[in-house]
């Protein structure tokens, strides 16, 4: 066979193979490659959405954490204020109670002083009568001289 005829036969076979490949083999390969490219693109898009969702979730979590910390700080502040007001109220109540107890004690002391003075006046009056009795060497009648004794008590 001639080189030209062989070359032409090979060209014909090559073009038939190329035509068959382009008609029957190439479209399924291209479809498979397109599907694969689409899956890869979808996967990348999903990854980007996942990243953006993650970033948004982190922002929401940070915002929630911040608001929870602020709420906790507010509650702590409110509790401290309430505790301080309770302490102040207790101090005020204690001061009022102390003042009341002191006033009661002073009133009791004044009453006791008055009672002791009255008792002392009675004793002094009795001693004065006894002294006068001894001086006069006679008995002084207390019933008769009650006005005199009361006046003496008042002077003392």
Swiss-Prot record:
- Keywords, A to Z? ATP synthesis, Cell inner membrane, Cell membrane, CF(0), Hydrogen ion transport, Ion transport, Membrane, Transmembrane, Transmembrane helix, Transport
Q: Which SUPFAM superfamilies match?
A: F1F0 ATP synthase subunit B, membrane domain (SSF81573)
Family indicated by similarity: Belongs to the ATPase B chain family.
Report the CDD domains cross-referenced here.
ATP-synt_Fo_b (cd06503)
Source domain of life is Bacteria
* PANTHER family cross-referenced by the UniProt entry: ATP SYNTHASE SUBUNIT B, ATP SYNTHASE SUBUNIT B', CHLOROPLASTIC
Membrane topology annotation: Single-pass membrane protein
| Principal location listed in the UniProt entry | membrane
Any one GO CC term of this protein is:
proton-transporting ATP synthase complex
Oligomeric state and interaction partners are given as:
F-type ATPases have 2 components, F(1) - the catalytic core - and F(0) - the membrane proton channel. F(1) has five subunits: alpha(3), beta(3), gamma(1), delta(1), epsilon(1). F(0) has three main subunits: a(1), b(2) and c(10-14). The alpha and beta chains form an alternating ring which encloses part of the gamma chain. F(1) is attached to F(0) by a central stalk formed by the gamma and epsilon chains, while a peripheral stalk is formed by the delta and b chains.
A UniProt-annotated Pfam family: ATP-synt_B
The UniProt entry, under InterPro entries, shows:
ATP_synth_B-like_membr_sf, ATP_synth_b/b'su_bac/chlpt, ATP_synth_F0_bsu_bac, ATP_synthase_B_chain
Record's protein name? ATP synthase subunit b
Q: Does the keyword ATP-binding apply?
A: no
Localization of this protein:
Cell inner membrane
> Which GO molecular function entries does the Swiss-Prot or TrEMBL record give?
proton-transporting ATP synthase activity, rotational mechanism; proton-transporting ATPase activity, rotational mechanism
Q: Which NCBIfam families match?
A: ATP_synt_b (TIGR01144), PRK05759.1-2 (NF004411)
Q: Where are the transmembrane segments?
A: 7-27
Gene3D superfamilies given in the database record: 6.10.250.1580
User: What does this chain do?
Assistant: F(1)F(0) ATP synthase produces ATP from ADP in the presence of a proton or sodium gradient. F-type ATPases consist of two structural domains, F(1) containing the extramembraneous catalytic core and F(0) containing the membrane proton channel, linked together by a central stalk and a peripheral stalk. During catalysis, ATP synthesis in the catalytic domain of F(1) is coupled via a rotary mechanism of the central stalk subunits to proton translocation. Component of the F(0) channel, it forms part of the peripheral stalk, linking F(1) to F(0).
Q: Which residues form a coiled coil?
A: none
State the species of origin.
Herminiimonas arsenicoxydans
């Amino acid at each position: 066979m001639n080189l030209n005829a062989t070359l032409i036969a090979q060209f014909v076979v090559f073009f038939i193979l190329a035509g068959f490949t382009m008609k029957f083999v190439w479209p399924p390969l291209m479809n498979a490659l397109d599907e694969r490219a689409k899956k890869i693109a979808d996967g990348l898009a999903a990854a980007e959405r996942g990243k953006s969702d993650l970033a948004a979730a982190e922002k929401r979590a940070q915002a929630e954490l911040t608001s929870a910390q602020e709420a906790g700080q507010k509650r702590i502040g409110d509790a401290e204020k309430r505790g301080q007001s309770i302490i102040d109220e207790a101090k005020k109540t204690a001061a009022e109670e102390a003042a009341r107890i002191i006033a009661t004690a002073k009133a009791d002391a004044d009453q006791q002083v008055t009672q002791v003075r009255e008792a002392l006046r009675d004793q002094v009056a009795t001693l004065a009568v006894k002294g006068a009795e001894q001086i006069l060497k006679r008995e002084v009648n207390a019933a008769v001289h009650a006005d005199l004794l009361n006046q003496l008590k008042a002077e003392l």
